[in-house]
Amino acid sequence: MSPELDQKLCEKYPLIMAERRLGAMQTAMCWGFDHGDGWYNLLDSAMRLVQSHIDMVNRRGYKIEQVVFEQVKEKFGMLTIYHRGGNSYTEGVLRMAEEMSRHTCEDCGKPGYPNENGWIRTLCDEHHAKYGNT
């Protein structure tokens, strides 16, 4: 993901991104988001839902451990989010974002599909044509 979009998510969700500026000996999140810009909206929406849920539940006197991203990357053509904290709701939101990435172009965010052979990437028709079966 571009440094600009990475920074935007860090600013909007500082609690989720608490490990973003730590070193490689402490977290894989130090490398940033390891995927294309097309999944930005999926992540932004998921992070907004996760943080608002945690804030709402904690305000009501219950306690949910803060979700903290440990690594976010493309793996086998889909978004993969490693994290700690949360509950079944936050887990469901993050799994839904991962599943939606299987149908979203990693480069531009348009509807997409995984390529049939080669390095698995989920791309729209335009980006499949641009890159071929990479």
Region locations from a protein language model:
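Interaction interfaces in information-processing and related assembly proteins
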Residues: P3-Q7, E11-G92
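Residue-level signal for secondary-structure boundary elements
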Residues: I54-N58, Y62, R102-E106, G132
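Short, flexible, mixed-charge glycine/proline-rich loop motifs
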Residues: K73, G92-H103, P114-G118
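Short leucine-rich amphipathic alpha-helical surface patches
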Residues: H83-G85, S101, G112
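Short cysteine-rich clusters marking metal-coordination/redox-active sites
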Residues: C105-C108, C124
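Basic (Lys/Arg-enriched) interaction patch that binds polyanionic ligands
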Residues: G109-G112, R121
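Short functional micro-motifs and their immediate structural scaffolds
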Residues: P111-P114, A129-G132
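Cysteine-rich micro-motifs
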Residues: G118-K130
